[in-house]
Amino acid sequence: MSLETTVFTFKLSNTFEEWVKMFDSSEIDAFHKTVGLTPLYRGKSLIDPKEVIVIHQAEEGVAKHVFSDPETIKNIEAGGHIYSTTKITSWVSN
């Protein structure tokens, strides 16, 4: 399998600062390690601070699989991520 870079953009129901506290928490770090995701970048839009981008790397298909799990969706929504606004694009280098 090849390495895949997955770009997520989405809206927040809370502030970016509140969301970042959750995203950068030790619990989320442990979750990422358990499922094999490596976060590369997270940031907010200069135009709309409630619009966020997150870039992950993992083995091909892992990110889409993890983020389509109903339990994962429930947990990320609890942190302020409005799942229905999520746009996902995937990229490979080969």
Regions found by a protein language model. Give the residues of each.
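Short S/T/G/P-rich N-terminal loop/turn motif that feeds into the first structured element of a domain
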Residues: 1-73, 82-94
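Short, exposed beta-strand-loop hairpins at the edges of beta-sheets
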Residues: 77-79
